[in-house]
Each structure stands twice: as structure tokens, then as C-alpha cells.
């Protein structure tokens, strides 16, 4: 079966009025703030209005360790949400807003795909309601206020050598990673080395995703630490008197965006922290609203279960107080074959032809990664469901191999064809998810707030990643000691590492053993509410490839966007 392009499917979808989409969730028109015809903001008044409704079954979609191509988590999230409606359930989907950086880079857009996508996909991938721009503006206002403070006398005694706050932009631009500002003489500022990160890596984005209300966002923005004084005291956005103006910029951005799928299932799109260099989950407020509107809320966590799902459990759920009922692990034939170590998958290039040949033994050779990621879900007391995301090049024997591994591990499993068939292609998956979500589970956090920061890092490294231990660069060790002394030790930990391996080395596939996690730097995201450990060579500002997706994107003679994928 040949499936049209995602853009063609998106444009062929019969969109329903957003009032009808909202009505599926019991949201009245008074709670909607339309942005054009196909997107609306949802008022935060909905949180209070819906507080007496029962809580939805809460399902998180994660994956095995992916290839650079991605394994279809967003597509599976949307397909599952649609399939639950086929079973007569009221369902809602919650996903992150895509960053325009990867949209114009190698990865392309992030609306799902085929007959399981968020539509219109052009709106989702390009600007949407401007939340990304609000985050960028609020972040850079704080940068400007900080530099202005230095220029106007430095009343707070900020140490220019201990400034941790950079600037952000929603573009992949490697030339901005390291820059010098303030050149040109005294009238043009104070020269210092700094740089740009991508907006999705901004702490302001993480604050947006983890805030529970407008007032909570105001408090969190005020707590952002931008650097330290000469005596080692933290300097905050509140100290710089920037937090109020930042909140004013973000006042509309805190409201989730309502869209729909190709089958008119409601979707809440909100916030977009990256899954490898941030905590990688959509917003708490979107889940708080959708969780009171539906029988089932299906949300997505970035990259593999060791990344986005671990942070979903230990950062997002710790903050929101919501408790998941089931977790879906997306597995693909190609990813498991890649984990066999017999093939190399490169972003932007076709798969090796020999990788497409029927070979269930190669699938089984990479199955240790699936086994470990099932275990990572179980560590948190949640029932795992393996979703085999089917591709046209797969073979039945290869699906059977994945099913056999999942069943050996005691996990439910279903083969899903939601890309080519929409919700009806994910009915088996929806049925086993309902079974898993309706059985009792004992959700638990991986570590208590009271554990020290080293213990938290080492718990994640050894129990989730499979490391033998952790090594710390001297600067990282000093930072941990300083953060404990300042009073930041009770915060959870977000570990930034490659998403292409359970380890910090992207070349180590499967479920590697006999390795040590190297922590080279530790930062404090106090506004967001976590400590941020950086392992290996992580880039907080991506670059463009040799042939970025931007080269293919244009408008036609009718003003329609072409080339977006």
C-alpha cells in the first residue's frame, strides 16, 4: 500500500471546527481563544472548572534506544489516541511543540506521520501560536538585563567569569555556539565570551513545561540562576528585576494549544524541551487539563525510555503529582537490527539494502536493548506495553521475533500499522494498553528528594543506563559540592547525554556493560527545578547538515508550502 506524503494527507484531512474538537473533551467555547481556524489556546480557567472530574488513565509513550531516523513515537502516540476512540473511549493526545531548528535541519518536522499525525502539519511545525518565539524573547530579555546590569555598574557584584546564562535562537546555527559580545568600545557593552543555545534547550522552555499555573511560572522564572557573585552567591532573574517582564512575555504561552489529528482526535500541543539536552516532555498544564477531560490521556516522552521516560517519571510526575497507568515502548525492526551492531544507520541516507532483507536473527541479536528498556519501565512500577511500529519493508518473522522477546520479558505486545491505516491499524495496541492501564500498578520514583545529588546521578547511571559507576570531571565535582552547600541538593537530576545509546557513547549499541558514565559539567536549572548533568560531547546548539531540509522547502504559485516533511 502506497501512502501519500504527510503534507498531502494533512491537506486532505477534513478538519472539524475546534469547538467540536473541544466539545469531545467537555470544554466549552468560553475556554477557547482561537488563533485562526485550526488552532486555539485553552484558558487556564479550565484547570479549576474541571477539577471535580475523574482522572483519565494516563499513558506515556516512549521507545527503545532509537536510530538517528527516529522510530515513530509521535506517530504511535497519535495512532494510539485515535485507536482508543475506535474502542469507544474518550481520548486526548498531548505532545510537544516541534522546534523549527530540526524542522529545517536533517530531522524534518515532528507532527507524526501518515494517517496518524497532528494537522495541519504546516501550522504545527512553523510558528504555531508563537510560544517558541515568546520563550526566545523572554530568555533573551534576561540576557539583555544581565549585560545591562554589568554595564551600568554591577550593583549585585556579578562575577563576569561565573555567568552561566547564554542566549537562545530557534535555529540550528553552529557558528553561534561560542561568541564574544560587547565588542566595539565602552558604549557597546562589556566584552565577554558567551554563546547561543537552541530555544528548546532554554531553561525558560523547561519552566514553561513544568509550571502548574501562571503564578507558579512567575515564581519559577524569578528563581532562574544566571550566574554567581564574587563570593559565590547565586544571582537570579528576580535579583535583576527581570522576572516580571519575562512573565508578561510568557502570559499567553502558558496556555496549551488545541489541535486535532487526521481522525479529529483532540491534541494538546504545548512546550518543546529537547529529549537529550533537556527533560523532553510536553507541559504539566496540558496534562492537568486533558487528564480531567478524557477517559485516556496519551502523552509522549522524548527519545528512549532511558531518556524522556525516566524524566517523565522522575521530573514531570514528581512535579505534577500525576501517576501513569501504563507505558508504551515503541520498537522497530530497523532499530533492533541496528542494535545488533551489524549495520550502520545514518541520518539523511537510505538504509543499507541488506538491512531490509528478512532476517529475524538480526532482530534477536539487538534484542538486549528492548529487554533493558522494558526493565527501565518496570523500575518505576508501571506496566510496559511493546508497540511494534510496522514498516512496509518489515517481514512477519521479524515481528514475531520482537513479540517473542517481549513475551519472554512478561510484557504485553502488539504490532501496529497506524502509519498506513490510522486508528484502525492500532486497535490491537489500544486493546492491550487498556488491559495494562486498568490493572493495578505501584508507580514509584527512582530516588527520594532527600538523596544527595551524586546518589541521584549514580542511581540513574547504574540502574537505568547499566553503567558500572560514574566519574566526575573536577569542575563537575566542585559544582555538585557547591549546589549541595547552597541548598539545591533536594532537586531531581536531568542527565544530558546521547540519545543513540544507553551509554554516553553513541557507538555503544544494544545494552552495553563494563562502562563508566563521564560527567564533565553540572549546571543548575533552579527555575525549572532540576540539576542538569552533562555527559560526553553534548551540543546545546545543533548545526545544519550538508543538505538540510530547508533546501527543499518553498511555496508554490498558490502560496502553499511545499517540501515540508
Swiss-Prot record:
GO biological process, one term: tetrahydrofolate interconversion
Enzyme class: ligase
One annotated GO molecular function: ATP binding
One Pfam entry name: FTHFS
EC number: 6.3.4.3
Highest taxon, organism lineage: Bacteria
Pathway entry: One-carbon metabolism; tetrahydrofolate interconversion
This protein's UniProt keywords: ATP-binding, Ligase, Nucleotide-binding, One-carbon metabolism
InterPro entries given in the database record: Formate_THF_ligase, Formate_THF_ligase_CS, P-loop_NTPase
Swiss-Prot/TrEMBL catalytic activity: (6S)-5,6,7,8-tetrahydrofolate + formate + ATP = (6R)-10-formyltetrahydrofolate + ADP + phosphate
Binding, ATP: 67-74
NCBIfam families associated with the record: PRK13505.1
Family: Belongs to the formate--tetrahydrofolate ligase family.
Name of the protein: Formate--tetrahydrofolate ligase
Species assigned in the record: Saccharopolyspora erythraea (strain ATCC 11635 / DSM 40517 / JCM 4748 / NBRC 13426 / NCIMB 8594 / NRRL 2338)
